[in-house]
Amino acid sequence: MVVVALIAAGLYWRSRSAAPVATPATLSEKDTVVLADFDNKTGDAVFDDALKQALAVQLGQSPFINILSDRKVSETLRLMGSQPNSRITPDVARELCVRTGSKAIVLGSISNLGSQYVIGVDAVGCSSGDTLAKEQEEASGKPDVLKALSRAAASLRTKLGESLASVQKFDVPVEATTPSLEALKAYSMGITTGRTKGDAEAIPFMKRAIELDSNFAMAYVGLAVEYANLGRASLAAENAKKAYDLRDRVSERERYRISAFYFQYVTGEVEKATEAYELWAKSYPRDPVPHGNLGYIYSALGQYDKSIVETEAHQHLEPSIVGYGNLAGTYINVNRLKEARQTIAEAQQKNFDGLTIRGDLYALAFLSGDAADMDRQVAWGAGRPGEEDQMLNGHADTQAYYGRLEKARDLARRAADSAVRSDAKETGAQWIAFQAVREAEIGNPTAARQAVAHALALAPGRDVKVIAAVALARTGETSQSKSILDALQKSEPSNTYLKVYWFPVIEASLALAQQAPDRAIIALEPSLPYELGAPPPGISMYPPYLRGLAYLAQKNGPAAAAEFLKFADHPGVIQNFLLGSLARLQLGRAYAISGDTAKAKAAYQDFLTLWKDADPGIPILTEAKAEYAKLQ
C-alpha cells in the first residue's frame, strides 16, 4: 500500500516562515525566533489574528529570519500539555522558545487613541529577557495599520542583523498581499483551523478571505491545498491557477510556493516544479518545505536515492510526520525494511500518528505476511474522513492480490462511499476506477467497463480518466480508450507524469489489444527511466508488466521473463498491487515459451499457492490451472 504524502497530508504546503538571521550582535545564522500572539489593546477583534499573520508574512519573506513553524509550535504545545490552538502569550512563547532551543521571541502590540493607532514590535531574548530590537510605528487610521506594521517589521529585520540590501530586495508590503484586515483574519483562521481540525473545516475561512479580497493570492493557494488534500483535484487546480495569475502580489517565498504548486498540480510540468523548489531551497536554505516536496517528486519518478537525500534534508531541518512517513515509505521502496521500521519507531516515540505512518505500517505488514497487523491498520482508519477510504482501497488491493475479488469489490465500494461522504467525489471515483483495472487484468471485461462508467459518471476528473483509459484498453474497448487518450494529450500536453508514464501505458495497452506487440514495446520506451516509480494516480510497475506481455505475444520467452522478474526484484515497489501476483503467472508462461518446464512449473505453483483461497471461476485463474495441468 503506497501512501506518499504531499497533497494527501498537505503539511508540506502549510503557510510557514523560515530561514535564519545573521548578525553577531543579535542572532546567529542558525537561531530561530518564536512569534507570540499580538497584544491587542484596541478592543477591535479584527486585529486579533490578522496582525500576527501579517507579521509572519513580513518576517517570513526574509532569507535570514527563521520563525518557528506553526507545525513545530503545535507539536511543542502538545508536549507541554496544551491544545495546539492555544493562545501564544508572552509566557507561553518563552517556554516554546526554551523547549525548542530558539533564541528570541517576537512580541507585537497595537493600541489606539481615538482614530490613531500605535504598533509595536519587540524582539526579546528568551533566556536573558534582554530586548534585542524594538520598533514602534504610528498609523493615522485603521486602513494604514498594515502599512505601519510593514514599516516596523522591515526596520526590525535590519536591527536583528539582516542587511539593508536584503530587506529592500525581500520586502513586499503586506498590504500588497491583501489590504483587507478582515481577509487576513479569515485567512489566518483558515490556516489555524486546517492545522487543528482538518482541511474540510478550513475551506469556509479560505473562501471568506477570497470573498473579502478577490485578489488574495495566498488565500487562493491555501484553498487549493485544502481541496487537493480532500481529493478534489479540479477545484484545487482552479484555485492554484488563480493564485499563479496573482503571484506578483506576494513575497518571493510565497511566489516559489505558488509556482511550484502550479507547475506540479496544474500543468504537471515536474521539471519546472523541481526548478522552483531548487531555487526556493537556495534562497531560503533553512526552509524544509522544498526539500520535502522534491523528495516526493523523486519518489514518484522512481528516483528513490534522490528522494531519500531530499527527505532526510527536510527531516534535518524540521522533523515532521509527513517527513517520517515519506522517508519510511521510500526505505520500503528500496527494500531497506529495517530502516523503515526504525524511522517509524522514531516517529512514534514523538507521538506522530497519521495516514502516512499507518500506510507504511500496512505495507510492512503485507511484506511480512502479517494479516492481523494489516487488519489493525485498516481498523485504525475507520471513521476518519480522508483516511478511511485510503486504507480501505489499500486493503482492496491486497484482496485482489490474492484473488479474493468479491472482498476487493466490497472494499472498493466502501472506499468510494467513504470518500464521497467526505465530499471527495474525485477520490471516490478513483477507487472505483482502480477496481475497473483489477477486473480488466483478471479477465472480467464486462465488470471493468461497468466500473469505468460508474467512475466517469461520478467525477470525470483527469486522474479518473487516466485510470479509465487504461482499464478500457485492457478490456479491448479501444475506441473509447483512444478517445480519452486523445483528449488528455490535447488538454495535458506538458504533464510530465502523463508523458513519461501514463500515456505510454495507455498506448501500449491499446497496441496489445490490437495485437501489435511491436508497437507496444516502442510506445513504452519513454517510461524506461521511470518504470519503477508510481506517478499519480499511482499504480506501480505497469510498464514492465505490459512490456512483458508484449514479449509473450512475440513468443520471446527470455525477454518476457526478464520483465516479470523485475517484480520479484522490487517487492517494496510493487507491494500489494495485483500486478505483483499476476507477474508470477506471466513468468511461468515466459518460461514455458522458453522451454524451461521446471522453472515454468515452479512459477505456476508460486502463483497458484498465492491464489489458493481465490474466488472460484476467475477467468485468469481458470486459464492458469489449465496451463499448469498441461505442464505435468
Q: Predicted segment positions?
A:
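Acidic, proline/glycine-rich low-complexity intrinsically disordered segments
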Residues: 1-346, 350-354, 372, 385, ...
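TPR-adjacent "capping" and linker segments in tetratricopeptide-repeat scaffold/adaptor proteins
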Residues: 22-27, 167-187, 245-255, 381, ...
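Canonical tetratricopeptide repeat
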Residues: 186, 220, 253-257, 291, ...
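Amphipathic alpha-helical repeat scaffolds
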Residues: 191, 207, 225, 261-262, ...
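Position-specific recognition of the canonical hydrophobic site in helix A of tetratricopeptide repeat
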Residues: 194, 228, 264-265, 299, ...
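Short coil loop/turn residues that delineate tetratricopeptide repeat
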Residues: 215, 248-252, 286, 319-321, ...
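Glycine-centered coil turns and helix-coil junctions that link the paired helices
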Residues: 230, 262-266, 363-366, 533, ...
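Helix-coil-helix junctions within alpha-helical repeat/solenoid scaffolds
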Residues: 391-392, 397-577, 582-610, 619-631
